Amino acid sequence: MHIGNRVNLPMSTWIDVPHCNLISIEDNCGFGENCAILTHDALAKEFLRATRLGRVTIKASCHSGMGTIILPGVTIGPRSFVGAGSVITSDIPEGVVAAGNPARVICSLDEYLDRQRAKLETLPNFKYSLYDFKNLTDARRAYLVSELEE
């Protein structure tokens, strides 16, 4: 198994350990809780007397939301986002946002980021480095709550 630099891989991520040598995760990738990365499909092995194996390649700067399932034989292109709860059954191209079961391309990453930037101009927003779990003090928690009350 190859895991690049600056990869956020939570402990709850399920990795297909017997065939983990078929998994490659490049730099700057992130996963939400409870994701699964599968390199084999033994569902019909009783009937087929065989199992499907396939590489999983996750290119640089990809991010998968909570509960994403990545099936054997797929590549997720660089700079792509996958929505929470998605099932990746085929390749995801570079620079897109994909979601669903099976996952389909929703829009380009640039379109998504433009929409998010516009939202940040009108909604309360907070500098991530101050409010991530490592730096979230009681005072910052209280400030967040007060800012988000309506």
Model-derived segments and spans:
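C-terminal segments of enzyme domains that contribute to small-molecule binding surfaces
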Residues: 51-64, 69, 103-150
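Extended, small-residue-rich solenoid/repeat segments and analogous flexible loops
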Residues: 1-8, 12
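Flexible, glycine/small-residue-enriched loop-and-beta-strand segment within the central core
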Residues: 10-75, 102, 108-110
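Short-chain dehydrogenase/reductase
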Residues: 63, 81, 97-98
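Beta-rich strand-turn-strand
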Residues: 67-82, 86-90
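Residue-level recognition of short, solvent-exposed, well-ordered loop/turn junctions
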Residues: 2-4, 57-59, 77, 93
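Acidic, glycine-centered active-site loop in nucleotide-sugar glycosyltransferases
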Residues: 93-94, 99-102
